[in-house]
Amino acid sequence: MASESSTHKTKLEKKTCLSFLSSFTRSQIVYPTQGISHYYPSCHMMVHAMNITLCDNFDFKRANPNYHPYILRLYCGVLFWIQCLRAGNDVNDLTDVQHRFLNRFLDNHPLETLAVPGPLLGLFKTLCSSQPEFPHNHNGKVYPRIPAQPGPARRDAFMRDLLESHFLPNVPGIFALLEDLTAFLPNTSRLSKERQAHSRYPKYPDQSLNEAFADCYSNFNFQVTSAADNLEKISSFLHMKHSMAWFNQVKGVADDVAASFEGSGTLADCSPHGLVANQVMVVLSTPEHLPESPNCIADKRATYEFGYQLKSTVRNLPPLAEALAAFSQTYIRMFPNHPFFGTFGSKTLDHGPFWKIRPIGSSLTDNSSYLTIPSIVKQAFKGPAT
């Protein structure tokens, strides 16, 4: 135990020291807050395995005549854009046009009414802003950025000549598929094979599903499109400039799909800020056989294996964040010798200060986990709701 004299001496020394330094106590270090950092998100792991499972189930198709793979792609594509807008809103990086549209959409379609099927819930949770851990939380947030001008000035241009556009849901393109599908099917005087031959896009569902859906197509009340439609604004790109009513019918299909899968939720379960999975880059490995130019939708010649490495500068990543990043692959770097998109995800240093942190850690290459996705989706499928 310290003596009374030593305690008194310590207090005296401290008081003397403070008296000498009193004029300098106002000099305090202020750590600058770095700007926000962004990445361009990818939807290439979305929906396909679910659609294959649903198309293979006779009971589901019979119970849900409004279902078609294109409708589910349309719904999930719209939600992908909306969730990215929510993340952008969290970091105050939306344009006035985007902000007004987001508020209008959520007024018409509250988060609790937007079903998210179980296999996709984790994917949508990764589309958020997140706070880096280092240094001292002074780095700005990391978030998925979408183009302020999502579409071209004319619909018949199909999409913007922008690399990022190829990895975002092409909602006008899905509408083109729907219109193309229904343009031939109502004409019962043609043989199914002849209709398929005249269609621009071979359909991966069976022909009976296409024909049954044609009878339900008018239920959706989709707006009439024109080649001259300007798709530069988000409301026009998502086909909601004049009315959002058609989306209610699409939501009904999504409700039926979500009810058929374990672990489903709503967009209200997907916070616009939270998971640090978006601080992990999924670097795709060069496949043994490079993809070829596709001639139609879902052309297998354009597909490739999804071997990958995980890379990040974060030192204390939760295991769940790494698993979610690998499963959802919403933030990717394409392998450099892809014949069309080899530079996607490679130029990150100009996307904000977070990407300049070093060193970068890496995982081992995983060449097999992606093969389990179809079985994971099938295991989550409960069958049509009764």
UniProtKB/Swiss-Prot annotation:
It is found in: Cytoplasm. Disruption phenotype: Recessive resistance to auxin conjugates indole-3-acetic acid-leucine (IAA-Leu) and IAA-Phe, but normal sensitivity to free IAA. Defective in lateral root formation and primary root elongation. Resistant to manganese- and cobalt-mediated inhibition of root elongation probably due to an enhanced ATP-dependent manganese transport. This is IAA-leucine resistant 2. Keywords: Cytoplasm. GO terms for biological process: auxin conjugate metabolic process; lateral root morphogenesis; response to metal ion; root development. One of its GO terms (cellular component) is cytosol. Its main location: cytoplasm. Regulates an ATP-dependent metal transporter (e.g. manganese transporter). Probably involved in the metabolism of auxin conjugates such as indole-3-acetic acid-leucine (IAA-Leu) and IAA-Phe. Required for root development. It comes from the Eukaryota.
